[in-house]
Structures are given as C-alpha cells and as structure tokens.
Amino acid sequence: VIDMVGTRRATDYGKQFCADFLRDLAVLCPDVLVVSGLAYGIDIHAHQAALANHLPTVAVLAHGLDRIYPYVHRKTAIDMLAQGGLLTEFLTGANPDKHNFVSRNRIVAGMSDATIVVESAAKGGSLITAELAEGYHRDCFAVPGRVTDESSIGCNRLIRDNKAALIQSAEEFV
C-alpha cells in the first residue's frame, strides 16, 4: 500500500510524475494499492493514474460518505468504487471542515507502507502526511524539483533534512 500526496496546485511536472510512476509501478507491482485524499491537484491525479493503469485506489475522505468533495471529482469517486473504494471516519452529514483534512491525513499515512510526496510548497497537508508517516515508522519518499519552484520547496526540504528519500522512478522505488 502506497499513498501519493502533494499540492492542490499541481504542475505539469507533478501530474506527469504521477502518470509515469503509476504506469511503471503497475507493471512492476500490479497488486499495489494507491491511497490518497481525492483533493484537487496531486491527489486526484494519483487516483486517476491508478484507475488508468488498473491499480486499485482508495480515497480517504475528510467528510461523510453522503457527499463527494470537491464535487467535480464525483466521476472519479464513482469509478473508484469498482476498483478500490472510499473510506472515512466521519459520520453521514459531516462537512469537509479544515480540521477534518488533518485527521484524514493521519489515516492516509497510517494505512500505507510508504508515503510519496510528489510536490509540496513550504507548508501544506502533504508535509503533515509525511511527518505522520515518519512517526508511524513508514517509508517516506519525495520527488525532487527545481529549487526555484514554489511547488518543490517542501519536497526538496524533506530530502535535504533526511525526512524522505529522493525518488525519481518506479524502478528505483521497487
């Protein structure tokens, strides 16, 4: 089980990494489960790349099962029901409140053997997930980026501070 997380403002670089990594991982480890949070950005691209490569994928939601947030990800969520599923600790009617996202990240990190941070600014939920993964003694990886890119600051710091191993491909991950 791996989780792929990152910024909600994914760049083409991050989107392409998700697509290429999961395409290659599907060949090397066809039974791997991909977990993320169904959010904008890296999360949704990870789910969609998993589906495109026939990998099971699970979204951990920050609200009840009676809604999909963001609503524009409803089709992907429905597709995931046949190839993974949706998971939440929140009761029906629970709203996607800010504190629920941090709680959701705890489950994402806890159910995964490895966390992969694809892109992250200096602050964000994906860095919280990486910190939680470290606390759970899980493997953590980060995709390096250009030092001038805001969306790479968090990943580069994780690597620099030895909080995550540098990852460039599925082959070296396996």
Which stretches of residues belong to each language-model region?
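Glycine-biased, small-residue-rich flexible motifs in mid-sequence functional cores and linkers
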Residues: V1-V174
